[in-house]
C-alpha cells in the first residue's frame, strides 16, 4: 500500500475521511451486503513517519497499520462519501468495544505464517457486561499476494484512535444496524462515549506501559491488530490476545471451505505463556504470547528471582477463563520443543538441546521436564550453582520428588556443602518409593567418605554393589574401597581390590595409577623392596614424575630398608624438585635427609623453603622444633612446638616432644607431666608414653629429674600415615592416595632419639580446609559421570607424604670415631646427646637465625676459660689456644649474611607459648646474668668478639671422647639424690672477671657461662672440689648407663663401679658437659632477652 495513502489518514494533515480506502474493502462472505464504513486509523502519521520494523519481525512480513477488524463480506465497489454516510448504522459508539467472538477468531485457526494480528489497546480488556461490546467497524483492504508489508508504530498516548472529524461526522449522522452474520451477536445498548482523557487513561491502565510495536495477524483475508506489551521478566514486548467474557464461549472451528489453499492451519511460530500485566477489569486477564522466541527469552542464568516468581505465580500461568484451545496449543508447543531437545541430546549436541529446552520454558516457564533436562545438562557441565537453582525451582513446584532431591544432594556434594548434601539425601530416602537406588547410595558413600566416616562409607558402597552388581561405577567403587581399606590398615584386602581393577582401572585412571597405589600399600606394610619395584615400574613410564621420585627418595631415606642411601635419597628428591619446585613436602624430606647427615645448616634452609610454601603445616614446625632442640636452642624449640600445637593440637608426638623439652631443660616436672598426659590421651596405646608417665609419677622421680631423660630407645609402634591436603586438582598421573591419617614411613629404631619420642598416628589430621576432616575423595565426586574421585587419582599435592615429626631422624649417630662411643650414640639420653653435641655455633641454626650476639666469644668467657684451664688441666691450654686461632681465622662456608639470617629467623619464629619455661629455683636471675654478660662483652676484644664461631677440629673432639671413655667412675649411694638436688641450689651468681676467687661455686658458674657462649667441647673445663667432681661424674655415668639395654645394665654398673680411679675422676674434661638445669636456664635467658631485643628492633624499624 503506498505510503501517501497512509499519510492522508492523519488528522493533522487531512481532516476529511479517506474515501479512497472505501474502494479497498472486501468481504470473505459472499452473502454479506454490509456497505463499507469509514476508515479507522490509530493515530496521526506523517508521510515520513513509517518506523522500522522490530528486530524480531522480518520487513517482508509487515504491512501498514490497519487497526480495523474485518467483517466477513464480499468485495464491493468503491462508494462515494454520500453513499457511505447513508449506509452507516445509527447509534454506533466509536469508543465502545466488541465482544470476543466478534473481534477475533480462534487462535488455532490462524493460517498465514507470515501475517500477524493486532487489536487496539481499547479492545484488549473485555468486561463482564455484554452491553459494553458493540459491533466493531471493520474494513477489508485489498492486499495482493506480492505486495510488500510494512509495520507502523502504534500512536502515542495523547492521540485518539479515530480522527476527530470522523468522530463528529459519525455522531451527527444516524447509523443503520447492519445485518448479523453467521457469528453475529444480538444488538445491545451502548454506553455514551467516554471523554478523550478517560479513553487515554483506560488505554494506559489496560496496557500498563506505552506499546512500542504492534502485531498484525490475518486469517482468510481478515486482519486483527493486537498491541504489544513489555515482557514481564526481560522487558521485551509481547503480544496480548483478548480473552472472551465469562458468558461467551469459544467459536467453533472454521469450516473447511474457509481454509487456505494448502488446507493446513499454521500456528504461531513460538507463542510464549508468561504472566500477563495486571488488568483493571476482573476476570479479564489476557493470555501472554509472542510471535518470536527472541521476544521472550528465558535467561540461561537462572537466579533465585525465578524461584520467587514461581512461588508467586504458580505453575499455571494461564488465566482460569482461557480458552481450551489456547491451553492445548501451548501444551503441544512445549512437548514439541522438549522432543527436539531430546533428539539433539541423542546427537550429542548439548547446545541445541539446551536451546530447545529453553524454548519449551518460553511456552511454559514452569515446565518440570524442561527444567529437569536443563539442570541435568548444567550438572554434566559442572555448572552446579545453576543446576541447583533449577532443582530448587522444581522442588518448589513439587517437593515430593525423591529423584530431584537425590540430584540436588549430589550437586551440594560437588560444591563441598556437606551439611546440605546430607539433608538432601535424607529427603531423597524419605520421598523415594524404592530407596534401593545404586546411584543414591553411591553418593551417600562418597558423602560419608568425605566426612571421614570410613565404616559408614564402606557400608554404603557395599549396599550399592549388592543392589546392582553390574553398576556402571563398580570399578570406581572397588578403587574407593581399596583406599578405605588402606586407611584402615587392611592391607591384604586393599591389595586384592587394587589387583582386581588392575586390568580395567576406572577412567581416567590408568594402570600406572593402580601400580602406584599398590606400591604405597607395600610401603605401608614396610615391604620396601616390593614398594620400590612398583614405584620403579611407574617411573619407567614417567621418568620425571615428581611424586614417584619423592616416594623413592623417602624409601632410600628409610634406615630399615636394605637399600638405605642418604645421598641417593637426596638425589631423588632433588630431581623431584626439578620437576616441581613448589612442592613443600619435597623440601621437607630433603631437610630430613640433611639432618640424618648432621648437615644442620642445609637442613634448616630446606625447612625454611618448606615453611615458605606451606606455613600452616604442623609437621614442618614440629621438625624445626626438634632441630632447635638438638642444637640446644630450647626457646626456639619451644616456639616451634607451640606453633605446631596451635595449628593442630591433636598430634601426640608434639606433646611428647614438649614434655621432653620441659623435663630436660628446667626440670619442670609438672609441665612435663601435663604434656605427657596429653600425649597419652591422644595415643593411649603407646607403651612408651605410659612408661614415661609411670617413671615421673613414681616415688623416686626426684632422682631422675636430671639424669633420666625420655626413653632412649623408642621403637616405631605405629604404621606410617599421611596427612591430607584437600582441594588439589585432579591429575592423570599416578600419585599415592593420601587419607587423613597418612604419614611417611619412619626411621629405624636405632636412629630414634630419646628426646622426642616415637612416630605415632595422628588422631586429628592437619587440614588446609576446615569444612571436611579426613578428606579422602575428590573435591567434586561425580555420581553420573565416569570421573573417579580425586583422592584416588594421583595429583601433584595429595601424594605428598607429610610426617608427624619423628625426631629419630635428627639425632646424630655420633661424630666421633671411637668404637665404644658408637654403642651409645643411637640410644643416648638427651643429656648425653647434648653433651656430645659440639658447641660450635656453625653446627646450629644460630648462624642462619642471626644469633651472633650470644655466640660471639666474650672476654669474660675467655679469661675465665684460661684461668680454669690453667688450674685444672694445663694440657687443655694448648688445645684452647689452637681453637682460638681457628675461631679468628676460619669462617663457615655457605653461611648466609646477617640480613638474610635475620629475615630467616623472623619468617619462622612463632609467638612464645604458654606456659613459658620456668627458671629453676636457685639459678641466677636472668636480668642480672644478662647485665654481667653485657659488661663483660664491653671489655672483649673487638676482633675476637666479632668473629663468627667456626666448627671445631675433629681431632679435638676425638680427644675429648677418648678422655670421656677413660672415665670409669663408681656410682655410690652416697652421691644420689641429695647431691643431685642440692648442688644446683648452692651455686651463686657469676662474678666479674676482676673478682677472681678459688671457691668452687664461682668455678662452676664460669664453666656454665662458657657453655652458654657456645664454645667447643674442649673449652668446657672447670676446677671443682672433690664432692662436686663426684656428683658430676656420677651424673654422667648414670646417664650413660640408662641408654643401654636393660639386660646389660646391672653388668655395666658393676664394671663401672670397679673400673674408675681417682686420677681419672680428677682429669676427666667431659664430666661437667652434661647440661645442668642452670646451664639450660641461662641459655634460655639469653634467648629470651634476644627475643626482646629483636622485638625492639622490629618496632624501631616500623
UniProtKB/Swiss-Prot annotation:
- Locations of Low complexity compositional bias? 64-84, 166-187, 195-205, 889-907, 1021-1044
Signal peptide extent: none
Intervals holding TPR repeats: 334-367, 368-401, 402-435, 438-471, 475-508, 512-545, 584-617, 618-651, 652-686
First-listed, main subcellular location of the protein, grouped into a coarse class: cytoplasm
Q: Name one GO molecular function term.
A: RNA polymerase II cis-regulatory region sequence-specific DNA binding
Show the ranges annotated as biased composition (Basic and acidic residues).
849-865, 872-887, 932-941, 984-999
User: Which residues lie within the region annotated Disordered?
Assistant: 1-94, 166-209, 739-764, 808-1102
Residue ranges with Polar residues bias = 1-17, 25-36, 85-94, 751-764, 819-829, 1002-1020, 1057-1068
**Gene Ontology BP terms:** negative regulation of transcription by RNA polymerase II
UniProt keyword list: Cytoplasm, Nucleus, Phosphoprotein, Repeat, Repressor, TPR repeat, Transcription, Transcription regulation
Q: What is this protein called?
A: General transcriptional corepressor ssn6
Amino acid at each position: 500500500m503506498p505510503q501517501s495513502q497512509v499519510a492522508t489518514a492523519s488528522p493533522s494533515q487531512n481532516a476529511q475521511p479517506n474515501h479512497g480506502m472505501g474502494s479497498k474493502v472486501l468481504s470473505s462472505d459472499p452473502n454479506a451486503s454490509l456497505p463499507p464504513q469509514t476508515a479507522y486509523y490509530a493515530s496521526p502519521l506523517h508521510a515520513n513517519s513509517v518506523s522500522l520494523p522490530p528486530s524480531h519481525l522480518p520487513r517482508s512480513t509487515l504491512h501498514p497499520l490497519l487497526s480495523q477488524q474485518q467483517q466477513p463480506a464480499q468485495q464491493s465497489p468503491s462508494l462515494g462519501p454520500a453513499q457511505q454516510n447513508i449506509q452507516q448504522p445509527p447509534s454506533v459508539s466509536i469508543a465502545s468495544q466488541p465482544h470476543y467472538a466478534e473481534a477475533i477468531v480462534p487462535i488455532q485457526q490462524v493460517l498465514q505464517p507470515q501475517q500477524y494480528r493486532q487489536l487496539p489497546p481499547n479492545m484488549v480488556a473485555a468486561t463482564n457486561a455484554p452491553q459494553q461490546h458493540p459491533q466493531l467497524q471493520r474494513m477489508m483492504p485489498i492486499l495482493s499476494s506480492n505486495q510488500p508489508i510494512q509495520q507502523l508504530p502504534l500512536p502515542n498516548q495523547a492521540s485518539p484512535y479515530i480522527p476527530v472529524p470522523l468522530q463528529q461526522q459519525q455522531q451527527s449522522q444516524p447509523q443503520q444496524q447492519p445485518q448479523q452474520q453467521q457469528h453475529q451477536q444480538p444488538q445491545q445498548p451502548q454506553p455514551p462515549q467516554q471523554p478523550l482523557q478517560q479513553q487515554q487513561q483506560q488505554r494506559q491502565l489496560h496496557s500498563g506501559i506505552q506499546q512500542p510495536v504492534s502485531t498484525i495477524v490475518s486469517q482468510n483475508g481478515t486482519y486483527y491488530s493486537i498491541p504489544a506489551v513489555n515482557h514481564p521478566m526481560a522487558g521485551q514486548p509481547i503480544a496480548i490476545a483478548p480473552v472472551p467474557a465469562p458468558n461467551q464461549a469459544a467459536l467453533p472451528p472454521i469450516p473447511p471451505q474457509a481454509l487456505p489453499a494448502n488446507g493446513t492451519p499454521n500456528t504461531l511460530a513460538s507463542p510464549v505463556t508468561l504472566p500477563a500485566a495486571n488488568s483493571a477489569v476482573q476476570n479479564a486477564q489476557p493470555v501472554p504470547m509472542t510471535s518470536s522466541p527472541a521476544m521472550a527469552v528465558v535467561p540461561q542464568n537462572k537466579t533465585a528471582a525465578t524461584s520467587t516468581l514461581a512461588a508467586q505465580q504458580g505453575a499455571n500461568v494461564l488465566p482460569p477463563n482461557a480458552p481450551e484451545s489456547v491451553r492445548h496449543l501451548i501444551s503441544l508447543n512445549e512437548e514439541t520443543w522438549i522432543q527436539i531437545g531430546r533428539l539433539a541430546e541423542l546427537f550429542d549436541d548439548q547446545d541445541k538441546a539446551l536451546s530447545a529446552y529453553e524454548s519449551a520454558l518460553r511456552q511454559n516457564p514452569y515446565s518440570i521436564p524442561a527444567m529437569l533436562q536443563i539442570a541435568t545438562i548444567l550438572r554434566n557441565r559442572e555448572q552446579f550453582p545453576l543446576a541447583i537453582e533449577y532443582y530448587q525451582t522444581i522442588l518448589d513446584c513439587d517437593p515430593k520428588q525423591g529423584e530431584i532431591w537425590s540430584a540436588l544432594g549430589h550437586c551440594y556434594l560437588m560444591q563441598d556443602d556437606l551439611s546440605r548434601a546430607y539433608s538432601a539425601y535424607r529427603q531423597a530416602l524419605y520421598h523415594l518409593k524404592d530407596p534401593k537406588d545404586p546411584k543414591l547410595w553411591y553418593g551417600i558413600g562418597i558423602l560419608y567418605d568425605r566426612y571421614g566416616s570410613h565404616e559408614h562409607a564402606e557400608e554404603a558402597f557395599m549396599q550399592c554393589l549388592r543392589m546392582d552388581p553390574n553398576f556402571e561405577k563398580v570399578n570406581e567403587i572397588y578403587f574407593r574401597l581399596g583406599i578405605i581399606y588402606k586407611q584402615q590398615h587392611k592391607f591384604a584386602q586393599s591389595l586384592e581390590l587394587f589387583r582386581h581393577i588392575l586390568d580395567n582401572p576406572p577412567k581416567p585412571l590408568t594402570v600406572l595409577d593402580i601400580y602406584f597405589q599398590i606400591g604405597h600399600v607395600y610401603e605401608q606394610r614396610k615391604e620396601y623392596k616390593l614398594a620400590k619395584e612398583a614405584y620403579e615400574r611407574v617411573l619407567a613410564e614417567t621418568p620425571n614424575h615428581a611424586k614417584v621420585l619423592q616416594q623413592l627418595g623417602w624409601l632410600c631415606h628409610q634406615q630399615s630398608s636394605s637399600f638405605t642411601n642418604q645421598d641417593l635419597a637426596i638425589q631423588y628428591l632433588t630431581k623431584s624438585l626439578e620437576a616441581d619446585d613448589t612442592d613443600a613436602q619435597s623440601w621437607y624430606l630433603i631437610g630430613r635427609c640433611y639432618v640424618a647427615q648432621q648437615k644442620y645448616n642445609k637442613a634448616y634452609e630446606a625447612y625454611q623453603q618448606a615453611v615458605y610454601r606451606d606455613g600452616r603445616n604442623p609437621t614442618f614446625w614440629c621438625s624445626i622444633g626438634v632441630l632447635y632442640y638438638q642444637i640446644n636452642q630450647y626457646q626456639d624449640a619451644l616456639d616451634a612446638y607451640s606453633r605446631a600445637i596451635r595449628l593442630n593440637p591433636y598430634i601426640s608426638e608434639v606433646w611428647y616432644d614438649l614434655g621432653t623439652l620441659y623435663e630436660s631443660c628446667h626440670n619442670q616436672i609438672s609441665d612435663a607431666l601435663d604434656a605427657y598426659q596429653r600425649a597419652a590421651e591422644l595415643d593411649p596405646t603407646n607403651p612408651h608414653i605410659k612408661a614415661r608417665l609411670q617413671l615421673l609419677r613414681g616415688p623416686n622421680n626426684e632422682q631422675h629429674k636430671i639424669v633420666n631423660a625420655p626413653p632412649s630407645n623408642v621403637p616405631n609402634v605405629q604404621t606410617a600415615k599421611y596427612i591430607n591436603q584437600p582441594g588439589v586438582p585432579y591429575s592423570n598421573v599416578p600419585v599415592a592416595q593420601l587419607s587423613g591419617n597418612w604419614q611417611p614411613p619412619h626411621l629405624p629404631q636405632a636412629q630414634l632419639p630419646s628426646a622426642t619420642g616415637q612416630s605415632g598416628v595422628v588422631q586429628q589430621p592437619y587440614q588446609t580446609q576446615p569444612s571436611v576432616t579426613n578428606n579422602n575423595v575428590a573435591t567434586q565426586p561425580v555420581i553420573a559421570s565416569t570421573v573417579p574421585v580425586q583422592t584416588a587419582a594421583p595429583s601433584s599435592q595429595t601424594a605428598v607424604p607429610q610426617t608427624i615429626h619423628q625426631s629419630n631422624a635428627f639425632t646424630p649417630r655420633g661424630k666421633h670415631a671411637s668404637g665404644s662411643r658408637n654403642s651409645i650414640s643411637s640410644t643416648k639420653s638427651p643429656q648425653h646427646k647434648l653433651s656430645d653435641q659440639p658447641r660450635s655455633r656453625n653446627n646450629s641454626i644460630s648462624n642462619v637465625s642471626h644469633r651472633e650476639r650470644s655466640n660471639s666469644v666474650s672476654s669474660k668467657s675467655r679469661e675465665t676459660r684460661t684461668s680454669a684451664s690453667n688450674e685444672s688441666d694445663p694440657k687443655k691450654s694448648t688445645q684452647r689456644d689452637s681453637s682460638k686461632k681457628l675461631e679468628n681465622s676460619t669462617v663457615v662456608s655457605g653461611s648466609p649474611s646477617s640480613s638474610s639470617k635475620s629475615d630467616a629467623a623472623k619468617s619462622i619464629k612463632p609467638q612464645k607459648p604458654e606456659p613459658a619455661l620456668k627458671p629453676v629455683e636457685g639459678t641466677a636471675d636472668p636480668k642480672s646474668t644478662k647485665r654481667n654478660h653485657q659488661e663483660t662483652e664491653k671489655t672483649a676484644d673487638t676482633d675476637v668478639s666479632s668473629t663468627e664461631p667456626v666448627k671445631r677440629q675433629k681431632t679435638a673432639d676425638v680427644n675429648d671422647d677418648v678422655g670421656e671413655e677413660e672415665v670409669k667412675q663408681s656410682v655410690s649411694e652416697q652421691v644420689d639424690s641429695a647431691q643431685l638436688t642440692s648442688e644446683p641450689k648452692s651455686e651463686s651468681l657469676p662474678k666479674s672477671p676482676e673478682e677472681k676467687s678459688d671457691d668452687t661455686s664461682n668455678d662452676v658458674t664460669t664453666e656454665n657461662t662458657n657453655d652458654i657462649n657456645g664454645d667447643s667441647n674442649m673449652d668446657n673445663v672447670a676446677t671443682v672440689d672433690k664432692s662436686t667432681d663426684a656428683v658430676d661424674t656420677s651424673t654422667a655415668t648414670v646417664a650413660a648407663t640408662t641408654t643401654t639395654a636393660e639386660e646389660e645394665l646391672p653388668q655395666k654398673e658393676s664394671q663401672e663401679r670397679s673400673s674408675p680411679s681417682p686420677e681419672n675422676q680428677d682429669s676427666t674434661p667431659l664430666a661437667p658437659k652434661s647440661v645442668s638445669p642452670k646451664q639450660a636456664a641461662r641459655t634460655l635467658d639469653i634467648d629470651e632477652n634476644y627475643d626482646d631485643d629483636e622485638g625492639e628492633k622490629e618496632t624501631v624499624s616500623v
